[in-house]
Amino acid sequence: PLGGKRAAPDLDVRKCLPCGPGGKGRCFGPNICCAEELGCFVGTAEALRCQEENYLPSPCQSGQKACGSGGRCAVFGLCCSPDGC
């Protein structure tokens, strides 16, 4: 319906940066990179690119569904927030 939660387009939320081997993953936080086939990398070299998110002006979102307390579904049923999985 007009004026409902879905009335305004989500122009301010973009996909988070790609990361990990071959750029197959997505950043879930400044130190977290999750890739469908590989799982999640936390605080490793694969997640280093995710620190760039701190310097970008617009917010981003990874994962399809919300889970836990402010998290998003990552891989293999794992729920990740910017602080951890």
UniProtKB/Swiss-Prot annotation:
Cystine crosslinks: 16-60, 19-33, 27-50, 34-40, 67-79, 80-85
InterPro entries (alphabetical): Neurhyp_horm, Neurhyp_horm_dom_sf
GO MF annotations in UniProt: neurohypophyseal hormone activity; oxytocin receptor binding; V1A vasopressin receptor binding
SMART domains in the record: NH
SUPFAM superfamilies per record: Neurophysin II
Family that this chain belongs to: Belongs to the vasopressin/oxytocin family.
Name of this chain's protein: Oxytocin-neurophysin 1
Organism: Papio hamadryas
Gene behind this protein: OXT
